Amino acid sequence: MEKELKKILSILIAMMLSVSLMACVKAADSQTQTKEEDNLLSGKHHVTITVQDYGDINVELDADVAPITVTNFINLANDGFYDGLTFHRIIKGFMIQGGDPLGNGTGGSDNKIKGEFSNNGIENNLSHTRGAISMARSSNNDSASSQFFIVHKDSTYLDGNYACFGYVTDGMDIVDKICANVKATDDNGTVAKNNQPVITKIAVID
């Protein structure tokens, strides 16, 4: 009987600890979200993506439509996160994708962000037309971190499912050259490591 009581007591203690840990995690999430909201950008912002051996791609970002996405992207750029990374996935007629520190589509930054698109409960009227910049993600709507893609040809079927956050204002000829010159190793657009175009820097203009 005594052994059974001890066993029940240990189970109850374990359950209480589990609940307290969950409460701590929820509190931390709430504090992080509040902090993010307090520091979100607004308005239009501009960045230049310099690609080694190709040139500059100038992009206008819309923080009024996608404040979480733009703020995250600009913070990473200002921290130098993208410097030296690559475009690891290229599909001519669709898009070029980069921003993965592992260079294989599985990596990202330490921070995952809310997916700002309609099928995730957030209004976003930016369309995935030629020149759009948008966040790559996994099947989890809130899994985007650092990987982004630039649309090569109109792909409006992506609207509502991916967080478009701006458009190329100058340099689509660079995207055209990358799509024309870089050959993928499979139908998924995988580019061999030694052939991946290098992002020298993403400079934040304003």
Regions found by a protein language model. Give the residues of each.
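Cyclophilin-like peptidyl-prolyl cis-trans isomerases
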Residues: 5-12, 18-206
